[in-house]
Swiss-Prot record:
PANTHER family reported for this sequence: 1-(5-PHOSPHORIBOSYL)-5-[(5-PHOSPHORIBOSYLAMINO)METHYLIDENEAMINO] IMIDAZOLE-4-CARBOXAMIDE ISOMERASE (PTHR43090:SF2)
Stated name of the protein: 1-(5-phosphoribosyl)-5-[(5-phosphoribosylamino)methylideneamino] imidazole-4-carboxamide isomerase
Compartmental location: Cytoplasm
Statement: the UniProt record of this protein carries the keyword Amino-acid biosynthesis: yes
Annotated gene: hisA
Domain of life of the organism encoding this protein: Bacteria
A Pfam family: His_biosynth
Enzyme class: isomerase
InterPro entries, sorted: Aldolase_TIM (IPR013785), His_biosynth (IPR006062), HisA_bact_arch (IPR006063), Isoase_HisA-like (IPR044524), Isoase_HisA-like_bact (IPR023016), RibuloseP-bd_barrel (IPR011060)
Length: 245
């Protein structure tokens, strides 16, 4: 399982939100490229970037920062989400050296777009499913739909999606542990690899995720915990690598 540091971008800075609320943000750095360097030096094998402004506006806003990080680390797999709602945007990021694009809102509102994107950019597409009480949320989590996460995830199995990033909104930024039972259930219900996100606080939470014995869970995204020092990236990755269960 990969430990994936998150860099959330808002107005060009690296921030963390609580439960997806833009008005409840903490700025951790005005230099996201240097922050990326910190996690790379800490031994991370993949980075998770989110354009928060883009998620709300429906198009990239912090794209220059994303491109700068991708150019600085050409051999590091980088995944970007937030405001990706057109093939042109995907093409822009892929050409900039980004490994994966995360389709969220558009995947819910127009699921056929995912198949289209996978066909145009095979191996590059991740679907981001953000949920509240098992129902998918969209538009920067501002809207909660009537669509159930597992039902939607199954729909994408034939499309060639590389992974699903599953975030439990109630847990995100709260550092109270991620929703392990539902994450494991999602991984069991679909053939698509699942990346857990939201709420990881410390090594104990990583162990709980591994103890779920869900082979479909291939990664864990962590944000506030690594910024506030309750989780060390290198230590957590070593723990995953050596985990025997």
């Amino acid at each position: 399982m990969l430990i994936i540091p998150a860099i959330d971008l808002k107005d060009g800075a690296c921030v963390r939100l609580r439960q997806g609320r833009m008005e409840d943000s903490t700025v951790f750095s005005d230099d996201p490229v240097s922050m990326a360097a910190k996690w790379v030096e800490g031994g991370c094998r993949r980075l998770h970037l989110v354009d928060l402004n883009g998620a709300f506006e429906g198009q990239p806003v912090n794209g220059e920062v994303v491109t700068a990080i991708a150019k600085r680390y050409p051999n590091l797999p980088i995944q970007i989400g937030g405001g990706i709602r057109s093939l042109e945007t995907i093409e822009h990021y892929v050409k900039a050296g980004v490994s994966y694009v995360i389709i969220g809102t558009k995947a819910v509102k127009q699921p056929e777009f995912v198949a289209e994107a996978c066909k145009a950019f095979p191996g590059k597409v991740i679907v981001g499913l953000d949920a509240k009480d098992g129902f998918v949320a969209t538009d920067g989590w501002a809207e909660v739909s009537s669509v159930q996460v597992i039902d939607l995830a199954k729909r994408f199995e034939a499309d060639g999606v590389s992974a699903i990033v599953y975030t439990d909104i109630a847990k995100d930024g709260m550092m109270q542990g991620c929703n392990v039972p539902f994450t494991a259930a999602l991984a069991a219900a679909t053939s698509i690899p699942v990346i857990a996100s939201g709420g990881i606080h410390n090594l104990g939470d990583i162990k709980t995720l591994l103890d779920a014995k869900a082979p479909g869970i291939v990664g864990a995204i962590t944000g506030r915990a690594i910024y506030e020092g309750t989780l060390d990236v290198a230590e957590a990755q070593a723990f995953c690598d050596n985990y025997k269960g």
